[in-house]
C-alpha cells in the first residue's frame, strides 16, 4: 500500500513539474521537443512498478504471495475450526438434554414414592457422548409429588439440637434410598447419582 501511494505521488509531482516547464518554455520547436521528452519520462515513471517487478528476485515475489496465501488459509481454517467446535458443543448439549429426558421418563414410569417425584435432571459427561455409559454424573432434583404433601408447619422452638439432627439424618436416609432406587431403574452406578431433596439435603458425589 505504501508503494502504491509513493508511486501515485511521484506521478502527480511529475505532472505538476511538466506543467511548470511547459509554462516557462516559449512557444517554439524547443517546447515541442520538451513536451516529447516529458511525455516519455512520464511513461517511464508510470511503468516503474513493472520495471521493479522484473528486477525483483522471483523467489521474493513467490514468498510474498505464499505468505499472503498461507495467512488467508490460516484465517479460513481457524473460522472453520471455530464453527466446528460450536456445532459439536450444540450437538453435545442436545444429546445430554435428550438423555436427561429419557432418564426422567424411565423414572416417572417406575419410580414410586409417597412424598417426592423426580423433578429436574442435570447430566455431565466427557467430550465423547455416545451412550448412557459416557455419563459422568446425574444430578436429580426431587420435587413434592403433589400439593397435598406441602404443608405449612407452625414454628417449634426446642432448646436442644436433637430433633434437628434427627430430621437431617432422616432426609439423608431418604435421599440415599431414592439414589439406590434410581440406580436400579436406570441401571447406572449409584456413585454417579446425586439426589437433591427439596429441603436442601443431598446425597451423592459432586
Swiss-Prot record:
It is a multi-pass membrane protein. The gene is spoIIIAF. This is Stage III sporulation protein AF. The keyword Protease does not apply. One of its GO terms (cellular component) is plasma membrane. The chain crosses the membrane at residues 1-21, 34-54. It comes from the Bacteria. The keyword Oxidoreductase does not apply. It is found in: Cell membrane. InterPro entries: Spore_III_AF. GO terms for biological process: sporulation resulting in formation of a cellular spore. Its main location: membrane. Signal peptide: none annotated. Keywords: Cell membrane, Membrane, Sporulation, Transmembrane, Transmembrane helix.
